[in-house]
UniProtKB/Swiss-Prot annotation:
It comes from the Bacteria. HAMAP family: MinC (MF_00267). Belongs to the MinC family. The lineage of its organism: Bacteria, Pseudomonadati, Aquificota, Aquificia, Aquificales. SUPFAM superfamilies: Cell-division inhibitor MinC, C-terminal domain. Cell division inhibitor that blocks the formation of polar Z ring septums. Rapidly oscillates between the poles of the cell to destabilize FtsZ filaments that have formed before they mature into polar Z rings. Prevents FtsZ polymerization. The gene is minC. GO terms for biological process: cell morphogenesis; division septum assembly; regulation of cell division; regulation of cell septum assembly. Keywords: Cell cycle, Cell division, Septation. The keyword Cell cycle applies. The keyword NAD does not apply. This is Probable septum site-determining protein MinC.
């Protein structure tokens, strides 16, 4: 059985509540995601570990077909649950405003110049990122920063920093993911990041 919840569009949460028959599950998933209301959404997929690798691959193919991209919820121990909780901000952050949270942060709006977002986990901005974004501040160098338009003043993941000049801040027009690769913070199109992008829900 599949449960779909709209956190606040364009973000939806899909939870696989029980394994059951894989063909029936895939059919149900396809039918639900085919509705126009979900078109172009970012999907948070919870409980994918109940599926076999080949079943999971089929689910991922459907998610890629019907969504902007997807993020897998990560199963955590009880001691980490509180600090890894997802914080959702349903507004644009103006200059001088600051959001800080020990877990993951989802911004349903823009982060304007001179606004700051600080997270112990990952940061997702469903809009323009023009301010400062610092992820993985509890020492997590596997954290990522996602934005529909990436034009930041400064990016930080763990202890690694990337300061961007005005000339470097022109977004290519598609969603990007910032992550650590080697000794540097690199940007990649979000379409190529589904396999490693994880949210600590």
């Amino acid at each position: 059985m599949i449960e779909i919840k709209g956190k606040t569009l364009p973000v939806i949460q899909i939870k696989i509540k029980e394994k059951g028959n894989i063909d029936k599950l895939l059919k149900e998933l396809k039918e639900k995601l085919s509705h126009n209301i979900f078109k172009g959404s970012l999907i948070i997929l919870e409980n994918p570990e109940v599926l076999k690798p080949e079943e999971r691959k089929k689910v991922e193919e459907i998610l890629k077909e019907f969504s902007r991209g997807f993020i897998e919820g990560k199963k955590e121990g009880k001691e980490k649950r509180e600090e890894s909780r997802l914080l959702i901000i349903e507004r644009t952050l103006r200059a001088g405003q600051r959001i800080e949270h020990r877990g993951d942060i989802l911004i349903l709006g823009d982060v304007n110049k001179d606004a700051e977002v600080l997270a112990g986990g990952n940061i997702i901005v469903m809009g323009k990122l023009r301010g400062v974004a610092k992820a993985g501040l509890i020492g997590d160098h596997s954290a990522v920063i996602v934005a529909l338009k990436m034009e930041p003043q400064l990016l930080q993941i763990g202890k690694k920093k990337a300061i961007m000049s005005e000339a470097d801040r022109n977004s290519p027009g598609y969603p990007e993911v910032a992550k650590i690769e080697g000794e540097d913070i690199v940007l990649e199109p979000i379409e190529g990041a589904e396999r490693w992008l994880k949210l600590l829900l």
